């Protein structure tokens, strides 16, 4: 079997990463080893934890403002144009299913008057920037009148403050 020069270099680079103390090797979904820098893995853990704390803070803030808040566990299938149940993510190392994969993160209800409620979707983003797919989902939710508004919660200018932006 003849191996090309570029393929050989890539194989040697992967071998070097696997033996290095700087990299952590894990197995991907297709059974192929994936090398990640340990510093990036640590940074990802910190970012994910900070995002979870910020989500909890936003939820408490909305509840303090008199809104009923619940985790939204649905998502939009843009190809079929319908609301579907969000897929659970399985973590084989912790032997558990992660539920929080819906878009937006929360559904918020507030009584307005007899037989009238404000139904708002709340997406929590530390920087307040939505991806292209998330923007398309927001447009779909509003067009189909699933939510009356969609708020994007982001960190405010002052330490500890939260800003809500209308989509």
Where are these regions (language model features)?
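Catalytic phosphate/metal-binding cores of nucleic-acid and nucleotide-processing enzymes, i.e., regions
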Residues: 2-167
């Amino acid at each position: 079997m003849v191996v090309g020069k570029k393929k050989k270099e890539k194989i040697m680079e992967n071998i070097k990463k696997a033996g290095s103390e700087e990299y952590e090797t894990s197995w991907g979904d297709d059974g192929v080893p994936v090398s990640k820098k340990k510093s990036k893995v640590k940074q990802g853990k910190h970012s994910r934890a900070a995002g979870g704390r910020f989500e909890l803070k936003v939820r408490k803030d909305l509840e303090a403002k008199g809104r009923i808040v619940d985790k939204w566990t649905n998502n939009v299938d843009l190809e079929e144009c319908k609301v579907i149940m969000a897929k659970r993510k399985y973590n084989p190392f912790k032997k558990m299913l992660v539920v929080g994969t819906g878009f937006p993160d929360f559904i918020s209800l507030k009584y307005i008057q007899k037989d009238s409620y404000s139904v708002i979707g709340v997406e929590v983003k530390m920087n307040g920037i939505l991806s292209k797919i998330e923007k398309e989902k927001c447009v779909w939710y509003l067009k189909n009148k699933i939510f009356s508004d969609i708020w994007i919660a982001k960190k405010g200018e002052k330490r500890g403050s939260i800003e809500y932006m209308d989509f």
